[in-house]
Structures are given as structure tokens and as C-alpha cells.
Amino acid sequence: NKEGLLKKAGQEIEIKYILDLRDFPDSPYKDKFVKDFNVILNDPEISVVVEVIGGIKPSYDFVKSSLLAGKSVVTSNKELVAKKGAELLKIAHEKGVNFFFEASVGGGIPIIRPLHQCLSANRIDEIAGILNGTTNFILTKMIRDNMAFDDALKTAQELGYAERNPSADVDGIDACRKICILASLSFGKHVYPDNIHTEGITKITPEDVAYCENFGGSIKLIGWASRQDDGKVAVMVCPAFIHEDSQLAGVNDVFNAIPVSYTHLR
């Protein structure tokens, strides 16, 4: 894998530091661990910082400081990108460095780069997709195996798909952060999660599942963003009826899917 990375990057990639407050005396990388972020920040040899802490504090301070110091940043921190992305992108642009956050949306589906580059000459009209694998797995178990929500959630936790505290997933918070990131990129207006109507799947019952099946469809948690005629952007996250003919109907288990509707501009 090292040779493959070297070929793609064009230069050798070396991990010089690992920031962690804990001690790892038995780790083969023990010489790389540091507890003071300033060691990384003040080292002129460091050109890229990878943030994997999560949340806003202290991630925001570390990422902002890195960008201001002329270091590119890579992150999968969806909360950080959703709430502070516009500011951090502005700093990165001013400093001539990169702020990469492809992994923050869609479980690694390559959606951010296509929106930013491949579809940049088109007008994005709507995004409506399955953005959270945990809730999609739970709904799949409720549909296929006739499970109640609590039983499906327990199964997801046992398999490692859901956290011990699953609120961010089942309450739609994770999907909300992701659709805000996509909407901000697509429509050029920063969309804040606190302003978005967000409803999770905790109230879905087996009766709801059966009702949808009777009408030839199923329930999916959908993140939706659309450009309105007046120029405003409408965004929401909620369970939705998906007809069996829809592409999204066949997306099950922990998988994500993000259809994008656009207008080709001449």
C-alpha cells in the first residue's frame, strides 16, 4: 500500500507526529506521540494535518490554527464542517492551502469532489438521499425481519453499526449535518444545522412499515435540499415514503446513496 500511495502522491508521505493525551509505551509508534499541539503547529516540516478528534472543541481551534499557519487539513468531522466549514474554507483559500472533507459525507462515497468539480458547470437543483448507514440498517431490519425499532437498534449496536448512545444517528442529527454540508456546497449559501427541520426514526413502528408496504413502498430516512424559485434553499431531514420504483428503494443495510438533480447550463 505504501508503494501505491507513493505513486499517486508523487512523494513519500511520512507521519511525523500523533497528538494524544494518553501514553502508549508499548506502541511501535511511541516515539511519534506528542501531547502539545504547538509541537505540530510550529514545525515547518508539517504540511498536512489530519484531524480525527471529532466534535467542535478542540477540533475547531486545532484546524483553524493549522490553516492559519499555512498547513492543509484533512478531516471527516461532519459536525465541524457543517458548523464551521464556510469560515475554514475561507481561511484555507486566503492562505493558499487545502481544507479537505470528502469523508465527512456519505460513508466515503465520492460526492463532495464531483459536486465541487465535475458538476460545477451545472446548476444543482436538488439533492435527496440516504445519508446515514445506521438508520438505514435499522429500517432494513424493521422491513425485512419485522423487527420493532428497539430490537433493530439493539442488533445494530451488537454489530457495531450504532453507538452506545445512538442519538446522533436515530434522531437524524448526523444526516442533518451531512445534508447541510452538501447544500452549502451545491447552492453557495452556508446552511446551519440548527436551522433545519430534523426528524429521526425513533417513532417509526411496525404498523408504519406495513402501511407503506401496502402502498408499494418502504420507509427511508432522507436528507433533502432543494433550490426554490425565489432563490432560497429548502432543507430538511425526515423519514419518507419511498416507492419501490425509486432508485433509493433498493439501497438497504448500512449503505448510503445520494442522487443529485441538476440542470445543464449552456
Give short role names for the model-derived ranges:
Residues 1-69:
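N-terminal glycine-/serine-/threonine-rich beta1-alpha1-beta2 phosphate-ribose binding loop
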Residues 21-23, 54, 78-79, 86, ...:
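Short, ordered loop/turn segments at secondary-structure junctions
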Residues 35, 44, 83, 106, ...:
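Conserved active-site and cofactor/substrate-binding residues in soluble primary-metabolism enzymes
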Residues 73-74:
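A short hydrophobic/small-residue beta-strand
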Residues 78-99:
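Rossmann-fold NAD(P)-binding glycine/threonine-rich loop
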Residues 96, 100-162, 173-174:
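Rossmann-like NAD(P)H-binding beta-loop-alpha module
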Residues 153-250, 255-257:
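Substrate-binding/catalytic subdomain of NAD(P)-dependent oxidoreductase enzymes
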